[in-house]
């Protein structure tokens, strides 16, 4: 019943009047009958079972709706046939920290299961992060992505969490009108890639002891500029999300030459060795 409710919510998002920033007024709706909707003989988390109730045609152009529905139908089948089993494996095999190697050396490696790694590849192939940045369907690309995430989330074994943070990081870079550094441009390309071998996830390392609801005002981490253009960070983050990500964003205050730091927090890109090598 939960999946049926999710399916109905997804279809409503695509077929009812959805107001987008570039569409201040909805277009007229057309009535559709259940017989005109796609059907599937295989398990899917997109098409309701046994048959959907009458719904209203989307206000989006038919040229956009048809391929979107086809993709969501196919993805729904993949959720039922593959992703849900992987999600169950992720929940049955939570990550853990391996503190020592076989020789007693301190390593502190984060160990994740193979199903978790496979979720990353699937997310790239399906364009779960990439869709809204490709703009293939204009302002409807966000609605399309949201529908796909709704289908994916309940069966993802919580992999939807790092994907949401990855989307947030990509949006930050996209909002930078210049994408001011080669590193930013490279990172944006990886965050929005559909190729598993080049797709990156991003963490968000922001929360400090004084953070509360005022994350910016409670940030005490200081960033000292280095001669090579990087920053040396000094501070305490008591929560670091998506620790296995390929990159992360963190908040800090940049220290100037006089030892003073800005009141407004600056968003910095913290890179691991993988990014440095690419």
Predicted regions located by residue number:
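Short, well-ordered alpha-helical packing segments
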Residues: 149-153, 166, 170-174, 188-192, ...
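Acidic surface patches and DE-rich sequence motifs
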Residues: 101, 226, 256
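A short core secondary-structure module
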Residues: 230, 234-277
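Short, solvent-exposed loop/turn segments at the edges of secondary structure
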Residues: 164, 199, 216-218, 243-245, ...
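Internal helix-loop-helix
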Residues: 104-198, 241-243
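Glycine-rich, histidine-containing beta strand-loop boundary motifs that form or position
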Residues: 90, 101, 110-114, 162-164, ...
């Amino acid at each position: 019943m939960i999946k049926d409710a999710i399916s109905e919510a997804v279809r409503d998002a695509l077929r009812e009047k959805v107001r987008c920033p570039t569409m201040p007024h909805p277009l007229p709706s057309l009535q559709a009958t259940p017989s005109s909707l796609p059907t599937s003989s295989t398990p899917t988390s997109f098409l309701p079972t046994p048959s959907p109730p009458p719904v209203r045609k989307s206000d989006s152009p038919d040229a956009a709706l048809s391929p979107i529905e086809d993709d969501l139908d196919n993805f729904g089948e993949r959720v039922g046939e593959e992703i849900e089993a992987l999600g169950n494996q992720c929940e049955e095999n939570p990550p853990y920290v391996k503190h020592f190697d076989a020789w007693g050396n301190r390593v502190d490696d984060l160990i994740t299961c193979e199903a978790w790694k496979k979720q990353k590849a699937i997310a790239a192939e399906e364009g779960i992060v990439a869709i809204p940045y490709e703009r293939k369907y204009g302002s409807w690309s966000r609605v399309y992505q949201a529908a796909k995430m709704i289908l994916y989330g309940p069966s993802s074994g919580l992999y939807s969490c790092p994907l949401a943070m990855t989307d947030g990081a990509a949006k930050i870079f996209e909002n930078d009108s210049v994408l001011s550094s080669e590193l930013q441009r490279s990172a944006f390309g990886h965050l929005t890639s559909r190729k598993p071998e080049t797709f990156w996830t991003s963490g968000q390392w922001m929360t400090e002891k004084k953070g509360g609801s005022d994350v910016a005002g409670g940030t005490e981490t200081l960033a000292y500029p280095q001669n090579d253009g990087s920053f040396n960070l000094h501070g305490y983050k008591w929560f670091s999300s998506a620790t296995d990500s390929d990159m992360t964003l963190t908040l800090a205050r940049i220290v100037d030459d006089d030892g003073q730091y800005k009141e407004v927090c600056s968003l910095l890109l913290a890179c691991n060795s993988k990014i440095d090598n690419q």
